[in-house]
């Protein structure tokens, strides 16, 4: 079957590698279905038709995790019309190296663009995920650890403005996209302004412009640098 064929590509990887294989497969091959067709709520939508909503994606992630020997369940949260959240939302809780984490491939799917795969929602603790997810309807295991949080593992979770400045300088010089997680306390408006100043100063020094996207609840920033000077762009990601 397609699932077995897919799983075969990842069976030699370690547990974290298998998890990332599943995440990246979803991000690269499944389109979020804004029309919400019936099959988009099922595994066939994600794995058969390449389109799905959160429920279909979460079910597909669970199926692939089952196939690759990763403990996984589907988590479900209630809608909250007062906050403008019209629908329930589904994602996954996985167990990696014996520890429980939240994994939301749907949210990363909608954030990933320009060939940049996003990992903002890979291996989050409760206190991170519930910044922008409603409480779960059915109990899931407590996720209290963030040692396997993707950006932390990859050492792109930074705590000082100086570190951000050094990395920004390198990114401008090499013409690379800068993608990182801010861990130096809360990402307040004041901190964000300080970081924006850094991006713009370093870009301007090389006659470039900084285009910044911010996932505010998760404190993840993505910065592109382009030639020329003009309007700086700041986008709040949803």
PLM regions: where:
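Conserved active-site-adjacent core of cysteine acyl-enzyme catalytic domains
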Residues: 37-52, 56-63
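N-terminal accessory/pre-domain segments preceding catalytic cores
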Residues: 1-14, 46, 125-238
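Extracytoplasmic/periplasmic, Sec-exported soluble proteins
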Residues: 10-18, 49-57, 84, 114
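Generic solvent-exposed, charged/amphipathic alpha-helical segments
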Residues: 23-27, 62, 193-196, 200
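Acidic/polar residues at beta-strand termini and the immediately following turn/coil
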Residues: 33, 104, 213-217
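Hydrophobic/aromatic-rich core segments of domains that either
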Residues: 56-128
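Intrinsically disordered, low-complexity coil segments
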Residues: 8-9, 48, 78-87, 232
């Amino acid at each position: 079957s397609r699932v077995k064929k897919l799983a075969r590509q990842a069976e030699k990887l370690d547990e974290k590698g298998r998890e990332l294989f599943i995440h990246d497969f979803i991000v690269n091959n499944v389109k979020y279905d804004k029309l919400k067709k019936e099959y988009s709520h099922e595994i066939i939508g994600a794995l058969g038709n390449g389109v799905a909503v959160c429920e279909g994606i979460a079910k597909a992630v669970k199926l692939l995790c089952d196939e690759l020997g990763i403990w996984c369940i589907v988590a479900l949260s209630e809608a909250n019309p007062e906050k403008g959240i019209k629908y329930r939302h589904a994602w996954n809780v996985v167990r990696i190296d014996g520890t429980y984490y939240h994994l939301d491939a749907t949210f990363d799917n909608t954030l990933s663009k320009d060939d940049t795969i996003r990992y903002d929602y890979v291996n989050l603790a409760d206190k991170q995920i519930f910044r922008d997810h409603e409480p779960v309807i059915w109990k899931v295991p407590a996720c209290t650890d963030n040692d396997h949080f993707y950006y932390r593992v990859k050492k792109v979770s930074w705590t000082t403005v100086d570190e951000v400045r050094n990395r920004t300088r390198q990114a401008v010089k090499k013409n690379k996209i800068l993608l990182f997680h801010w861990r130096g306390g809360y990402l307040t408006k004041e901190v964000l302004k300080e970081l924006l100043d850094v991006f713009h100063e370093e870009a301007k020094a090389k006659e470039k412009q900084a285009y910044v996207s911010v996932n505010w609840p998760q404190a993840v920033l993505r910065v592109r640098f382009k030639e020329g000077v003009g309007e700086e762009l700041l986008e709040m990601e949803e």
